[in-house]
């Protein structure tokens, strides 16, 4: 009897029509329905005499039909980013060279890996939406490599009974069921490198080749990056499979790559670095056209098909982020969203480019174009420091006729310039940098773009005036924007060689940009101040007075000193050896993806404009503890307080002999 009742369809067919077939079977055969069947046993047996099974078959067909309709509706509402995600290399919107570079690394570190080889690490960087993670997954799938991806754990939801059990005074003491993210991350790396991935339902990939993918690091690593460095060092020793980190570039000034993976760690752990570029407009245009064609053929009149001009504006406004472009395309193609494309009729980007090449481009059209891009893309356009400096230093201009704008009178003709294609204030704002820091980079690189010494003098005057405006800490917050505007516009206006659109300014060849030497000089200055205060504490003078007034005279006096650290410091500060050749310091090149960050050893941002705190830089007069005499301290322990960058102590006799040799050499030369 029980076997018959197990296969009898329930009486509530209408309720079960909206449920899955597997769910119906499970509930009809489940244990939870046994009591219900025992209570309603006779009525169920009576109903089994009638042809209920045929009615059940009809309801099952209706359920299958409803499930198919629901799947179709779900596919229509599915995000196009997930619906059209690439499955092969040909579908990737990434440059072929980058794909080959990643594929070569995977073959060398996974497919051709030695048995006892340590853990290899790859760092992939690039802007958001350029296909970093997708490229790894697609290439791994094609080469039969398993991907074990780290996902930050979510804290479990506590129920009311859990809190009662934890804080129950009668029971024994209970700890919170919490484990730090760093501990969970270390355990994940250990398990992932030792054990293979579990074979889930529908997973046909069975191979021992695998990689570990980390895209979302625990937040604790951003506060304490040294913990991550220790994890990397240990993984290089004990790791059995490659480890890949994916970090997106940030244009807001937060350089996670420099914080988490400094150059020292990359060299120590032999970390490979592959940098992705934003998706090219041509590749993005081809990808969006394919999506529009498929959706138009599938949905017919359910979507609004954008024209070619709208797609061009969308590609230009998304700043190389294909994920943002696909989302904007899906949102704008929905029915009733025809007003998302505010543009001129008959205006295309290609026609606009033709106008600019033929020198017929006007300022109102340029302003309208910028408004179009901002309205369509839905994403703020930002600039890296390298490109922002290039726009200021190369200062491209648009040629204007007499009808476009009035000319200056003859006595002011030397100040006449063509109209700029960029707004300097907007360029600095899009670089997401403080204005005084941008002035430092501008001051370091502006000379190489000038051809006349008079223009350099005029530009240096503008930079000096800008530094004066931002030098006073009391008015710095109010005058910082004016200071940046004067510096950028002054440098642009002073360069007469680039004052007109037809001028090349010494050629349009590429010129490398460099980081400011101010950071290195100011770091050396701070170390000298701290060393002077540590080595000569009995002289109640600020560090600046010690180095400019006292120590140069002590170097000329014959006062016996037994402290080698003091002797070395006085010789380094108070004397300038004649054989030391002073020249330009070694400059560090500025890369195209680097942010303008303050040197970690140079202090706070307030030090950029020379506003040094009295306690750290100049040093307040420190009163020594009951000084009896003004003699130099003879303690040999002061040498340990000397910074590492200071020269090693050497005897004064050797320095005198060196000076004598130099004098003899010069006398022979004369």
Curated annotation (Swiss-Prot):
The modification Phosphoserine is found at residues 60, 75, 348, 635, 645. Residues 421-670 are annotated as: Interaction with MCM7. Residues 620-651 have a biased composition (Polar residues). Keywords: ATP-binding, Cell cycle, Chromosome, DNA damage, Nucleotide-binding, Nucleus, Phosphoprotein. Coiled coil: none annotated. Phosphorylated. Phosphorylation on Ser-635 and Ser-645 is cell cycle-regulated, enhanced by genotoxic stress, and required for activation of checkpoint signaling. Phosphorylation is mediated by ATR upon UV or replication arrest, whereas it may be mediated both by ATR and ATM upon ionizing radiation. Phosphorylation on both sites is required for interaction with RAD1 but dispensable for interaction with RFC3 or RFC4. Phosphorylation at Thr-622 by ATM in response to DNA damage promotes interaction with NBN and recruitment of the MRN complex to DNA damage sites. GO terms for cellular component: nucleus; Rad17 RFC-like complex; site of double-strand break. Pfam families: Rad17 (PF03215). Residues 31-50, 593-670 are annotated as: Disordered. GO terms for molecular function: ATP binding; chromatin binding; chromatin-protein adaptor activity; DNA clamp loader activity. NCBIfam families: rad24. Part of a DNA-binding complex containing RFC2, RFC3, RFC4 and RFC5. Interacts with RAD1 and RAD9 within the 9-1-1 (RAD1-RAD9-HUS1) complex. Interacts with RAD9B, POLE, SNU13 and MCM7. DNA damage promotes interaction with ATR or ATM and disrupts interaction with the 9-1-1 (RAD1-RAD9-HUS1) complex. Interacts (when phosphorylated) with NBN; promoting recruitment of the MRN complex to DNA damage sites. Belongs to the rad17/RAD24 family. This is Cell cycle checkpoint protein RAD17. It comes from Chlorocebus aethiops (Green monkey). The gene is RAD17.
